[in-house]
């Protein structure tokens, strides 16, 4: 009987303890801690990968050193001063819709048009510092690190831009060409490809350069409203 009585009292005490805890929880419910990562909205942006024909290459009667800046608006017509060249139309069009860009990876590849008997070599290199001057000779381009020298008659390997996770501002070709200082250019570009084309006995198409890239955009650009005519134009 004594053991039964102690067991009954124990059950009653445990029941009172559980009930007291339940009342305390109801009176002071736990407050969930805020999770800043969970509540933060996802960044507005997108990542794109694409390959485009960047440049058709013709050999002339003089050596050529071409400069291809890696920027959001690669769309430089031949003859742009300074000697920027190359057009990635899709990249340039997409970049108009965003404020900033990250070049996750960029490479250029040589694709030949010439016959197996064609002699000569094309050299491609990458310069990441706009303070560095452009080489003036075909052989000088081949000494840059990283660089690649390929026989004109071969479908050659690629030259890859060193990894750079810097966030750059988006800019179009004409605006980039108008920048004066190296520091200004470095705000919009991780560097430039340099392509050296040897001279030939006559002008001839020798190949093309393909660009392959993966880029990430952030911050949708604010589109400018249509021009509102002034008082002098409203009735015309």
Swiss-Prot record:
Name of this chain's protein? Capsid protein
The UniProt annotation puts the region (P domain, projecting) at 218-236
Q: Does the keyword RNA-binding apply?
A: yes
Which residue ranges are recorded for the region named S domain, virion shell? Answer: 52-217
> Can you list the GO cellular component terms from the UniProt entry?
T=3 icosahedral viral capsid
Location of the region described as Disordered in the Swiss-Prot/TrEMBL record: 1-46
- The residues forming a coiled coil are none
Q: Which PROSITE patterns match?
A: ICOSAH_VIR_COAT_S (PS00555)
Q: What lineage is on file?
A: Viruses, Riboviria, Orthornavirae, Kitrinoviricota, Tolucaviricetes
Which organism is this entry from?
Maize chlorotic mottle virus (isolate United States/Kansas/1987)
Q: What family is this?
A: Belongs to the icosahedral plant coat protein family.
For molecular function, the Gene Ontology terms on record are: RNA binding; structural molecule activity
Q: Where in the cell is it found?
A: Virion
Give the SUPFAM superfamilies listed for this entry. Positive stranded ssRNA viruses (SSF88633)
